[in-house]
Amino acid sequence: MRRNQTPEGHSIRPLRVGEQIRHVLAEMLMRGEIHGDTLDNLFVSISEVRMTPDLRIATVFVKSLGGASDDTVIGILSKNASFLQAAIAKKIRLKYVPKLRFLADESFEQGSRIDSLLRSPHVQRDLQENDDQEDDSEGSL
């Protein structure tokens, strides 16, 4: 296994570049450098940036943490994509500046749905029964 590969054999470079792009975009949002009246009053989270293996396309996962819908935020960011790409080109040294695609981050909803399922009475009852069975089997040894 090479130094710059994950155990599955994938290159680490797309992960590293994606994280650098995420930092640049998050910093620009924090400083209010992205044009759009709606973004001035909102908190927007950039949770992840996934790069294609050739580093030419960056999929940016965003979540609006305030009043506007994710679609509104994605629309504003998409309109400013060329401005954002130029900023990335100035701050990160790459052969090609990746094309930015913005998608709503669904992981927050999925996490809360899983959490609510784990807290449901049926699951709690099953977990309690499993704990009781394990205690009984340990006591008989």
Curated annotation (Swiss-Prot):
Provide ranges: composition bias, Acidic residues.
Answer: 129-141
Subunit info here reads:
Monomer. Binds 30S ribosomal subunits, but not 50S ribosomal subunits or 70S ribosomes.
* Protein's organism: Zymomonas mobilis subsp. mobilis (strain ATCC 31821 / ZM4 / CP4)
Where does the record place it?
A: Cytoplasm
Matching PANTHER family, A to Z? RIBOSOME-BINDING FACTOR A, CHLOROPLASTIC-RELATED
The molecular function GO annotations come to: ribosomal small subunit binding
**Function summary:** One of several proteins that assist in the late maturation steps of the functional core of the 30S ribosomal subunit. Associates with free 30S ribosomal subunits (but not with 30S subunits that are part of 70S ribosomes or polysomes). Required for efficient processing of 16S rRNA. May interact with the 5'-terminal helix region of 16S rRNA.
User: Which gene name does the record give?
Assistant: rbfA
Which cysteines are disulphide-bonded? none
Q: Would you identify the family this protein belongs to, as annotated?
A: Belongs to the RbfA family.
Keyword Cytoplasm, does the record have it? yes
- Name by which UniProt lists this protein: Ribosome-binding factor A
Chain positions covered by the region annotation Disordered: 120-141
Q: Which GO terms describe its cellular component?
A: cytosol
The UniProt entry, under NCBIfam families, shows: PRK00521.2-5, rbfA
